């Protein structure tokens, strides 16, 4: 996908393929109205007012056959998402009808849009910057209301504003350094001393480091916590999974070894998306299929952000239990003593003090798991502060870290007594790195790669 501006007219189906109440086929470009009009029987789309919805029929211009009864939205440039003429054909939902209309539009001169091309045009035409474009996809992929809140704030420009303001301050500082170098005789320009440059770079660094502190929370809310449910066979792992999901997605029986693979599900725990991984019971076994499941379970444990270790409170600790306690001790772990509704035989004195007694059968203390997750990952603070700007995108986090390193290089140079003018390089690099976040200084290959991750029709 080229990153140069293109003025051909593109089209794509913007709703998921399948049966539904409506389907939407979108057009964007200079000829959007003319192409839509060529297959539309109703009002003249080229004469109706912008941002209106118009009733009519889609017809095959060759045969005159009616394809569907539709409502057509007309939006004229520049007051559209792409800042081009946009037409959206609202059809009855269905694979056949939307595909037929799409093919008609292509035959009439539109080009099939590439993934993310509508949003790419919005970026190229200055409607959104790169962080806002990425926020569009984050909204689509948000699994909880908290993740959606962060994405909407980013789409609204909160992160862009912070980055742009910081870049402007850095640019002002660079300009002041340049004036001092080129025109040292000017008395009305504040001298950029070593002390003043140190003060400014420390101010920039502090701001970016504060932003980085939001990254852990933001990334969790955006991507979720990979959560491994581990334990020896038949201690209630799958029952716990089903309890958290509130539906029967895993096989639950009284036969040890019935979970022979890794089952993954997402669940919303107080606004935090947990990617729950129900692992096969980790034990020695001669069953080849079960052995594969056990190996996958060990891998899931190593990669997990959170480990829920389930023990059977109605039985004494086994060697397998002790092995799992040792295996998971360096993880963010919550120990769950299940089956507390039965007579307890487990040796509590051999366990860490932070276990939670639960009964999946009676739902006892399941809510405490949510509280412990909040304690482990958010220090019991609220998940999202309404006025805060959060980093949640791995690309943004990496670039902010690089920008901080560049500022540290400036401060290190100042500490070594380097002349102010020699430190311009690192300060300029900081300015360029921040520009990659918003797209002002992003390489063409990066922009192409980012938009290729979008879905068709967006």
Curated annotation (Swiss-Prot):
Its EC number is 3.6.-.-. Belongs to the TRAFAC class TrmE-Era-EngA-EngB-Septin-like GTPase superfamily. TrmE GTPase family. This is tRNA modification GTPase MnmE. (6S)-5-formyl-5,6,7,8-tetrahydrofolate binds at residues 26, 88, 127, 458. It comes from Streptococcus pyogenes serotype M5 (strain Manfredo). It is an enzyme of class 3 (hydrolase). Keywords: Cytoplasm, GTP-binding, Hydrolase, Magnesium, Metal-binding, Nucleotide-binding, Potassium, tRNA processing. InterPro entries: G_TrmE, GTP-bd, GTP-bd_TrmE_N, GTPase_MnmE, MnmE_dom2, MnmE_helical, P-loop_NTPase, Small_GTP-bd. The keyword Mitochondrion does not apply. It is found in: Cytoplasm. Exhibits a very high intrinsic GTPase hydrolysis rate. Involved in the addition of a carboxymethylaminomethyl (cmnm) group at the wobble position (U34) of certain tRNAs, forming tRNA-cmnm(5)s(2)U34. Pfam families: MMR_HSR1 (PF01926), MnmE_helical (PF12631), TrmE_N (PF10396). Binds 1 potassium ion per subunit. One of its GO terms (molecular function) is metal ion binding. GO terms for biological process: tRNA methylation; tRNA wobble uridine modification. K(+) binds at residues 234, 253, 255, 258. GTP binds at residues 234-239, 253-259, 278-281. Transmembrane segments: none annotated. Its cofactor is K(+). Mg(2+) binds at residues 238, 259.
